[in-house]
Structures are given as structure tokens and as C-alpha cells.
Amino acid sequence: MKSILSQLKTAVSEALIKAFGEDLKDTDPLVVPASNPKFGDYQSNVALSLTKILKKNPREIAQSIIEALDIADTCENPTIAGPGFINFSLKPSYLATLLKEVQQSDRLAIEPAENPQKVIVDFSSPNIAKEMHVGHLRSTIIGDSIARILEFRGQDVLRLNHVGDWGTQFGMLITYLKEVYPDALTKADALDIGDLVAFYKKAKVRFDEDEAFKEASRNQVVKLQSGDEESQKAWQLLCEQSRREFQKIYDILDIKLTERGESFYNPYLADVLTALDEVGLLEEDAGAQCVFLEGFKNKDGDRLPLIVQKSDGGFNYATTDLAAIRYRIKEDQAKRIIYVTDSGQAGHFAQVFQVAERAGFLPDDVEVVHVPFGLVQGEDGKKLKTRAGDTIKLKDLLDEAVNRSRADLEKRLAEDERQETADFIEKVSQVVGIGAVKYADLSQNRTSNYIFSFDKMLALQGNTAPYMLYAYVRVQGVSRQGGIDLSTLPTDTPIILEEAAELTLAKHLLQLSEVLMSVEQDLMPNRLCEYLYDLSRKFNQFYEACPILKAEGDRRISRLILADTTARTLKLGLSLLGIEVLDRM
């Protein structure tokens, strides 16, 4: 079914044409959820926007719209407030009818997108020979959630992992390993990621201090780039070692990705320069090939160049990103390309997108968008680090979340004198620990920095994953207590919405599709988190105010349907955030 918001927008659009003629057929009906319940459920200020066009008083325009509206089955009589706002209050009978559709649908009656597109979500993107750190957490979690929501909406999503698998660091690392540990370049599993990172750090020190080593490293890069068999094999072994470590993290987080690293685009880099030259954008500056940017200037007021080929003939990130855009549009046929990286790269992407547009790489029907996110901070408000001042490894952070979740659970079990199996304790600890980390990140406006606090994210109260999971568990508890299989509730029993808490919950349950459409457009997963938090609160209020199992007849079944629909909505919503649910905690 179409969302309530979509239905009301259509109704207001039709009323505008009926009242004022075809000239207004493309007018935005400006229907939004009401800012305050005292104004009803939805509002439109379209009458105010038409005063100049129609040369009429906005209240008079609003009255004409109301008289032309055909929503008697949907809403109570609309009212006019203030200078000309139209307020809509939904009828309980209409809500009950929609909830019956939701009850009988695997998708909660949420329609997929009318015109699905090929969408690429580029996220996570760690570097080979380096461990994933807390900065990769945000890209991985936010990108995964965006991909899940787009997939649920019916878009054809390609999830790409643009790993850093190319560049001078490999010449440096291979040269160093040849000296100190040649087995690592010929034997799989000769070293683990921790060793690889340590070797990388030592190689970097040598590179910075030893000119002969620096020269040997650069020669090694040339050999690698020219396809030298021994160098290629060594490079592939190093990549494979890192890949296995990345996969361990992705398995813990339940992340699905297609790897397509920087090296994939190597054959297409020269073509980028040719294409830029053909449209007259390529210029030489201090021996480098570049494109001078519009709107980007240095401190002297001169236009900034985007370098696409260095003076030594090497290519860089900008060249690779331009090649990737061309490939993704021409070969993958993408209509929307989403890049999920930290906000520090906003300038880079703005420059790359500008050059791609000016060069004609971007057709009018293709959207490229950077989805930036802020820093993860410690409780001191500074960038999250270990006590020794090092970057926190992602694996260590996730292990800590699960361990703390386990400790909280074991403490509760002891206080309640509850006995549970080791398997139960392990499962709950994993789901709550990992879910808490994901939700704490996703519930923030992604553009903001956020304070990482295990105590806050694992709390059973407040806007946390455990609070949401507990609301779901509560419904399953009703099922167990009443000996009721919620999946077999009758579909012909009317839904009764007489109590205020029933009505409030029903309205909220029917807003999920509006929220998902909003996230699909604006790529802000925190809106889904806010919706789920409000849903959990409204359900808990309903649970306290409206006894479920003590009710009788149709009222009992109606409340069971409301509870089950809440649980199904929580399960779907949390799954779109990459979070599992539990029947018991």
C-alpha cells in the first residue's frame, strides 16, 4: 500500500486541480507530519505558498482546497489553523483498515520503489597491510545500513569495497620483507596481520631515513606496475593476508561486500588523461598534468589544480576515482553512486565530482553523492585512542563490546537467580554487544562527531539497541505467557483503536514506509533509529496502559495484533540497521 503521506499528497494535489485548475498540477502539496499532535496528524501549508499566484487570502485558499478534497474515508473534517495551515486528523477506522493490510503482508505492506535503479554504495575501504581501526567502523556500519535500506526499497544495489591495494607502500613493504622475512612473499599464512602492520611501520621508518632503501622501494613499485611476475605474486599474497583479516571483521558485523580495489582501475587510468585532454581540460603545472578547478582557490587567490598525473608520471587517488566513476557509469550502468567516507574527504570528492561533470563523464541522469561522517571521540571529547595513544583496532573494540555485554548479562542473571546455558549467554552477548555498537553509531546524525561510551550504548534505558531489543523481547514474552503463536492470529478480527495508547501506537506503526523513503533520499539512517526508539516507547506505554492477555474477545486479539505488528516492525527496522533480534534476553 502507498504510505499515508503519499496518499494525502495525492489527495491535496487532486484538490488543487479541482479547485483552481490544471495550472497547479505540478504544485508541491507540502504535506508533512504534524509538528505537534494538537494540530492533528499531518499538515499542509500549500495555501500560504499560493497567495501570490492566486492573489487570494491564504485561509480562503485553504477553505477552497478543503471543499475540493475527497478524503472522507481517510480523515475527520480537515481544519484551518493560523494564517492558512490545513490540519488532517486520521480516522481510527482508516488506521484499522491499513493495519489489517500490514498484518497480512510479509513486507508490512510497504511498497518497493516504483522505478528501481542501479545504485553503487562504496563503503568500508580499508587499506591493505593495515588493521581496520575505529574510523573504518563508521564507514562500514553506515554504508551497510544505507545499502540494506535501498535493497529493501527494491533498488539494484552493488556494495563495493574500494580497498587501498596499490601504491608506493607496496614497493616499500616488499623491499623490506625481501631483506628480513622473504618467506612472507612466497608462502601463504607466513605471517598474520599484526606482524604485517609491524613490518609496514618499520619499512616506513627505513623509507623516511634511508635514501638507498627509498630508491629500491621506488624501483620495486615500477616492477610491480610493469607486471613483474615475482612482484605480482608477493603483492597478491600480502593482499590475501589482509583480506582474510578484513573478512573476520565483516563476519562479526554481518557485512556483505564485493571487493574492487584501487588496482582494478589501473588499466583505465591513462584513458582518463586522454579523455580530459580531448575536452581541453588537461593542463601542465610544474611538470604535473592537472585540471584547474572552479571555485577552489589557494591562499593567494589562484585557482587550485586537481593533479591527475604527478611529475614523475605516477597517478594518484583523484585519477583512480575518476576512472572508477567512468567505469561505474559505463560498465556497471549505475544511476546513483554513493561514497561513504569521513568528512575530511569532502573537499576531495567535491573536486573529483566537479572534474567528472566538466569532462562529460557524468550524464544528467546519474547522481554522485558523498555521504560524510564525523569522528568517533573518547569520553574526553578527543579522537578515540588507546591509553598508549594508539589508534584503537576495530577487532579489539568489538571484542570489548561483547565482553562488556556478557558481564552485564551475567550480573543480571545472578541478581535474578536465573540459570541459562552457555550457548544462550554467548548468543545474547554477541547480539547485544555488536548491536549496541552499531546502533550507537547509526543513531547519531552521521555528520556529527560522537562520544563513544560503552556504558551508554549498553544501557537498557534510553535510545540504545538494548532498549529496542527489550521491547521486542517483551512481545515474545506475551506470546510465551499466553501460549499464543502470534503468526496464527486471525486476519478477520477487527482492530479496535479506542484507547489513546492504542491509537498513538497504530499511527506510529503506519509511518515506517515514510521514514524509509526519507532515508533513501537523504541517506540519514539516524531517522530510522529515531523512529524505532519512538516506536519502542509508544509500545511500552501501550503495554502499561492496555492489558493484553487480560483483555477478552476481539479486544484481546486486536491488542495481540498491535503487539505482534510492533515486534515485526522492530525486527524489520533493526535488520535494516544490521542488528539481530532476540526472543529472550
From Swiss-Prot:
Query: Which GO molecular function annotations are given, in alphabetical order?
Result: arginine-tRNA ligase activity; ATP binding
Q: Cellular location of this protein?
A: Cytoplasm
| Biological process terms in GO annotation | arginyl-tRNA aminoacylation
Which UniProt keywords are given for this protein, alphabetically ordered? Aminoacyl-tRNA synthetase, ATP-binding, Cytoplasm, Ligase, Nucleotide-binding, Protein biosynthesis
Protein family (similarity comment) = Belongs to the class-I aminoacyl-tRNA synthetase family.
PANTHER family, A to Z: ARGININE--TRNA LIGASE, CYTOPLASMIC (PTHR11956:SF5), ARGINYL-TRNA SYNTHETASE (PTHR11956)
Q: What is this protein called?
A: Arginine--tRNA ligase
Recorded source organism is Picosynechococcus sp. (strain ATCC 27264 / PCC 7002 / PR-6) (Agmenellum quadruplicatum)
This chain is encoded by the gene named argS
